[in-house]
From Swiss-Prot:
Keyword Repeat on entry: yes
Residues found modified as Phosphoserine: 5
Keywords, comma-separated and alphabetical: Acetylation, Phosphoprotein, Repeat, TPR repeat
Protein name as annotated: Tetratricopeptide repeat protein 38
Family assignment from sequence similarity: Belongs to the TTC38 family.
Matches recorded under InterPro entries: TPR-like_helical_dom_sf (IPR011990), TTC38 (IPR033891)
Amino acid sequence: MAATSPLRDCQAWKDARLPLSTTSNEACKLFDATLTQYVKWTNDKSLGGIEGCLSKLKAADPTFAMGHAISTGLVLIGTGSSVKLDKELDLAVKTMMEVSRTQPLTRREQLHVSAVETFAKGNFPKACELWEQILQDHPTDMLALKFSHDAYFYLGYQEQMRDSVARIYPFWTPDIPLSSYVKGIYSFGLMETNFYDQAEKLAKEALSINPTDAWSVHTVAHIHEMKAEIKDGLEFMQHSETLWKDSDMLACHNYWHWALYLIEKGEYEAALTIYDTHILPSLQANGAMLDVVDSCSMLYRLQMEGVSVGQRWQDVLPVTRKHSRDHTLLFNDAHFLMASLGAHDPQTTQELLTTLRDASESPGENCQHLLARDVGLPLCQALVEAEDGNPDRVLELLLPIRYRIVQLGGSNAQRDVFNQLLIHAALNCTSSVHKNVARSLLMERDALKPNSPLTERLIRKAATVHLLQ
């Protein structure tokens, strides 16, 4: 899929009131090419992919500060490495700062550089403040919009994720490159804050302009998931598959949503076929964090449903084990832990828990390490207790923090794996103190998401163990 608008040179960026401090037209165009692929979730072969564009960009102008900001920012926003452990990434941040100090930059560019440096330190809220400062004066700065959107997602700041786009949406007129994608970005924030009708309208508008917009497809997939519209969801994914399957950075995740509908229906073999055909190959090909959490979450959900996943955890473990000490995102950590527990690797499990505990004891300004003690570690311990067959302990750990788990980020659909963990623990508990917890949780789930086959199965299970009396 080639870029639909011509790539912008120095003058075009000036005309857009987003001037870039470089005299290289080639660098400006490669910056645009990189940004376009990031927004579209697609490595465009005709442009050389994101990696190809970034290496050519650095060659075109090694001192281009915004080139460094987008390059380093994309690695950081991928959450697959940390400056503490990845010396190359640490050097990239330092180089970006040095380059920015050697030349006069616009205030907007200075804020971009500062935001990336702040994000690298793990202070996501402060980084978002800096990106928001940019958007106040430059509402059509797509890089600030996308970086802040992703960071809000990692923070579980759902209202901010929505409102950040609401504030700038009117400025994105159809003549601006990538404007239709802003509809999709806005629709996701609306969906996560339960404005389903408005979200669907915007996502469908985006798709009418560009049917290959995989992120807007993704919003619609979420809406069907949250409303338990399983038949509609399956039909939508099947009919649109040819349009989004080439968006290589998001296709795996869209297949994950497809598989969730099948798990919801109890069609486990069909779900495993999607896993084996699309999700695992994507994980093994690129090891992106989104593919990692999709793989772990799906296998864990199937296991809770009583499905044998065979040796599949052994395929995931080599990827997750490399990240046991990263502690970039607590949300990621919980999923890495699912893999080491599922693969019965106590050494990796212990390494993750010990190093996370260490990080929580000297968090500095790192928002994830600050949250580890009260939310991240209890959640991780609950996963361990579930594996060890201690359902009452799982409840003791999770019930006090269940309304704080949103702070770990991810979407409502992704975090539902933790809701299911809590319900399964409640169904298996033995303590009289907890005998009515399953009933309460299931009534709540049924009220929020009526007509869910998965909830109906859990209610039947509760009835057989006399927990609904």
